[in-house]
Amino acid sequence: MPMYQVKPYHEGSGSLRVELPTCMYRLPNVHGRTGSPAPSADHVQEASDPSLQALESHQDDILKRLYELKAAVDGLSKMIQTPDADLDVTNIIQADEPAALSTSTVDLNAMLGQDHGALKDIVINANPASPPLSLLVLHRLLCDHYKVLSSVHTHSAVRSVPANLLQCFGEQTRQQPRHEYQLGFTLIWKDVPKTQMKFSVQTMCPIEGEGNIARFLFSLFGQKQDAVNLTLIDSWVDIAIFQLKEGSSKEKAAVFRSMNSALGKTPWLVGDELTVADVVLWSVLRQTGGCGGMAPANVQKWMQACENLAPFHTALKLLQ
């Protein structure tokens, strides 16, 4: 049934002469024809152009893919924000096997830039009142991957630093020329509100916060992760800093429930390999003393697994 029907605007059988101005497109006068039937009322329902049909089909495909992507993002958001959510993301994105931490390294020149023979020196300012245990763990792991020239200093504004913090890197006996090392790691005990890292004044800004510095240092191991795992790792690091370390008691209880659920499925927080999420969460738990009797069984088992590793065990001695 047509939406509307146009009636003739004049009566009579005689043709109507209309003076038309000069225009770009001229159309035949539909009222000038005689003896022919009136145009069909459903003339607007003619067959569509094939190119238009193809365009509409392509648009439908794009909308369908957008709906699927939106559903995937909504599912990931629910899983990250809800501690007790049980969502199987393997159906959303096929996860690749992560590279083993002990066997993969990266080209430091590609990661940190070519310094034409100069030693790549990472300088970290940390407050001795709150030693960043995660960075000490990562330092030990870096020493297992690269030739690291380590040194510890005390800023002149700091009156005293415990002896164990001054020896946090162990006895440093430099037996090789400086240029034969691959990486420099300098720790300065300084009265700063947040842990700071400076690498290259010319090419990068200082990085602040234990979690952000840990992310940078862990990237030097070259561990490969898929997009889903990378999102989960970043989420765990943020949870450690903003909820477990600075949050209320309810937020901390929610973090423990979420950790207990994740560790009930895999030995580490994200998959079967140690990640920066494990390092930072372990560090925050030890700094805040939140690993006592209130921790669930899976979390306590995970804590013990961390401290069975030499880098964690060495860092733990600094709190004794």
UniProtKB/Swiss-Prot annotation:
Protein name, UniProt field: Aminoacyl tRNA synthase complex-interacting multifunctional protein 2
Organism: Bos taurus
CDD domains documented for this protein: GST_C_AIMP2
Main location: cytoplasm
Gene3D superfamilies with a match to the protein in the record: 1.20.1050.130
Region (Interaction with TP53): 162-225
Keywords from the named record: Apoptosis, Cytoplasm, Developmental protein, Differentiation, Nucleus, Phosphoprotein, Protein biosynthesis, Ubl conjugation
Subcellular location: Cytoplasm, Cytosol; Nucleus
Annotated coiled-coil segments of the chain: none
GO cellular component: aminoacyl-tRNA synthetase multienzyme complex; cytosol; nucleus
Post-translational modification: Phosphorylated on serine residues in response to UV irradiation. Ubiquitinated by PRKN, leading to its degradation by the proteasome.
Gene Ontology MF terms in the entry: molecular adaptor activity
Sites of Phosphoserine modification: S36
GO biological process: apoptotic process; negative regulation of cell population proliferation; positive regulation of protein ubiquitination; protein ubiquitination; protein-containing complex assembly; translation; type II pneumocyte differentiation
Ranges for domain GST C-terminal: 220-317
Subunit text: Part of the multisynthetase complex (MSC), a multisubunit complex that groups tRNA ligases for Arg (RARS1), Asp (DARS1), Gln (QARS1), Ile (IARS1), Leu (LARS1), Lys (KARS1), Met (MARS1) the bifunctional ligase for Glu and Pro (EPRS1) and the auxiliary subunits AIMP1/p43, AIMP2/p38 and EEF1E1/p18. Interacts (via N-terminus) with KARS1. Interacts with EPRS1. Forms a linear complex that contains MARS1, EEF1E1, EPRS1 and AIMP2 that is at the core of the multisubunit complex. Binds FUBP1 (via C-terminus).
Function: Required for assembly and stability of the aminoacyl-tRNA synthase complex. Mediates ubiquitination and degradation of FUBP1, a transcriptional activator of MYC, leading to MYC down-regulation which is required for aveolar type II cell differentiation. Blocks MDM2-mediated ubiquitination and degradation of p53/TP53. Functions as a proapoptotic factor.
Region feature (Interaction with PRKN): 82-162
